Structures are given as C-alpha cells and as structure tokens.
Amino acid sequence: TSESIQEPAGTKLRPLSLVGESVTGFGLRSCDNIKLLENGENLYPAMIADIEAAADRIYLCTYIFQNDTTGDSFVNALCRAQDRGVDVRIIIDGLGGMAYPPVIGKKLRKRGLNYKQFNPITLLPPSLHINMRNHRKIMVVDGKAGYTGGQNIGDRHLVKKSHNPKCARDLHFRLTGKIVDEFERAFFKDWNHCVGTTEKAIYSPSNTNRTESDVWTRLILDGPNENLDKLNELLVGVFS
C-alpha cells in the first residue's frame, strides 16, 4: 500500500508481514517499548503526564468520557496543553458519551476544546446508528507515544478507590516507536468521518529516523464498517 514502510525483508518475518499487510492494509511497524498499564490507577497518571509534556499535538479518541473527577483532570490537562499551542483533538462516541450523565460534551465545548462526536444521536431527523459505534480507545501525543486498550476515561476504572461493585478492571498499553504513526492514521480515519474531510496523519520525523527495533507490531482496525472476517483471514493466511 501507499502507507507501507520498509520491512524486515530477507528475514523469516517477511512472508508473514506481506500476508498481514494484504489483509489489514496496515504495515508491520517497529515498537521501541510496550508498557502494560492495569486499571486507571496506573493508566491515567501516565496519560496525563504525556499530555502535560506535549509540545505539538494530542489526538484522543474514546467511547466513554465521564464527567467526573477523572474526566475533569483530563479536561484541565488538555486545556493547559491547548493554551500552550498544542493541537488538541478529541473524539467521543455519540452513544457512549451519553452513558454516564451529565455528559461532558458541553464542558469540552465551553472550555474551547476541539471536540467531535462520532455519529451523534439525533431525534429530528432520526439518526441512531445503533450498530455504527466507535469503541476505539486511542491517544497519540506528539507522534511519539501511543495508548490503546480497553479502558475509557472515568472514575469507574479506579478500582482501588472504588466502592462500586461494577467498577471496571481492564488493561491498556503505552507504545513508542513507528507503530505510533499507525495510531495517528487510525485516528484521522475517524476524525475525517466526523468532520467530512480527507486530512492525513502527520508522520513524526522522530519516528522516521529512528533505528529499527527487534519488536514488531501491527495495528488491526475492527468495527461494524470493517471486514468482520479480517482476523480470521489473517490467521488462515499465516497458517496456510
């Protein structure tokens, strides 16, 4: 594809790499570091620290962004970044964003943050898009650090401090290296859907010039508008 990069040709990974790129449309990318972050106690401080250190851009996409103490800490950090001149863009799913009222959208707009709803729910004209929801949870900072996993933004992921039996235990990952370029590419796919543009991701020079790592990763997008057999096709291709 046009987004391909130079991969480890001549190695045992090359045939598997070609199968994966053919099925997913995403190339194999090197990753300098992968850090596992369990629950909000470990995830949120890391995310906010990266937001506070951002110098150029922050792209955040989440299914749920709760209007609570955790949500406020993110809003305040994102506002401080924007005040420094950082390009801050936020996507929240139109249905997931309504899961825990009061919704945070008005607060984001009032604070002047560049926030979009993914397929917002409207009654007139009726637009529900029940199955066309965005469950992706991605944050990219300066094209250098990328986050993804199962955690939304909200107090319910603070397991140690929560007395709620429905608190959500989950995992997230912080990655650095060339794989972060693909996170930005995925974000702009959703951003362009929200705003009706064809803007492309900004590939970070710091990633382009970086020495290849021994750790190789690939982004695989999933959703109701994606090929639901993509993972199955990938496994069949690998083992055939």
Where in this protein do the model-derived segments appear?
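N-terminal localization/anchoring segments of enzymes in phospholipid and broader phosphate metabolism
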Residues: 1-237
